[in-house]
Amino acid sequence: MDFFVAGSWRNRDAVAEVVDALEGAGAQCYSFVRAQYDDEALAFAVPGGADAARLGEPGIRSLFEQDLAALRSADRFVLVLPAGAAAHIETGIAYGLDKSCYAVGPADRSETLYRLFEAMCTDPADLVRHLAVADARRVR
């Protein structure tokens, strides 16, 4: 899989736009907005669905394991801003796994750790353009 796309449930429309742009450019993506979850996890895979859940619940464990497996198998990582704590934790995991990391969307404030991103793109089209240029440079 090419990309793991992370973001906030509150920003899921923007996440879907990034997934659409990447898939339109021929990439394969994993994202919570399109993931197929099993029955245990499905109840939690909705806006606010996991907010009051206990971490030990089987559905929460299933969600975590599926998302982590997808993150490990992805070649690159995209964070769609603004995003919450969970998506930022996923960013740290991706960086720790030595994935190329990109951000898309408005950065509400300057964060020094955002330097881990190879690029901070303004919108999905900007991300696709940046990736095309970066990929062309790697081929040379």
Question: Model-flagged regions — what are they?
Answer:
Residues 1-140:
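Conserved catalytic or regulatory cores that recognize and/or transform ribose-phosphate-containing ligands
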